[in-house]
From Swiss-Prot:
Involved in the modulation of the specificity of the ClpAP-mediated ATP-dependent protein degradation. Belongs to the ClpS family. Coiled coil: none annotated. Binds to the N-terminal domain of the chaperone ClpA. InterPro entries: ClpS (IPR022935), ClpS_core (IPR003769), Ribosomal_bL12_C/ClpS-like (IPR014719). It comes from Mycobacterium leprae (strain TN). It holds the Pfam family ClpS. It comes from the Bacteria. The gene is clpS. This is ATP-dependent Clp protease adapter protein ClpS. One of its GO terms (biological process) is proteolysis.
Length: 108
């Protein structure tokens, strides 16, 4: 969704009759806010498998994938990717297909 923001400002500081106005507008994409994908701890998947999925789906190194997996295991969740809403929807779908619990939310 695009929203047009229009700002009207007089060219001269004082408003007089026959004043010309300069129109400034810039499109603002309100859906361009950053989104994150969150993987949640579950009682089913082994830690080695979760690490493997992070490496294969996101191309993370083994140490980084292991760090994220341990965060999921110890804290109950971890942010594994961030970007546009559409790309996070794709990531969540891939994680679900791999059997992991994942959600997305707008980053604050």
């Amino acid at each position: 969704m695009w929203v047009m923001v229009v700002t009207l400002a007089p060219i001269e500081p004082k408003v007089r009759p026959n004043t010309t106005w300069q129109h400034e507008s810039a499109p603002v994409d309100i859906t361009a806010a950053r989104w994150v994908t969150i993987v949640w701890d579950d009682p089913v998947n082994l830690m080695a498998y979760v690490t493997y999925v992070f490496q294969k789906l996101f191309g993370y190194s083994e140490p980084h994938a292991t760090k994220l997996m341990l965060q999921v295991h110890n804290e109950g969740k971890a942010v594994v990717s961030m970007g546009s809403r559409e790309s996070m929807e794709v990531d969540v779908s891939k994680l679900h297909a791999a059997g992991l619990w994942a959600t997305m939310q707008q980053d604050r």
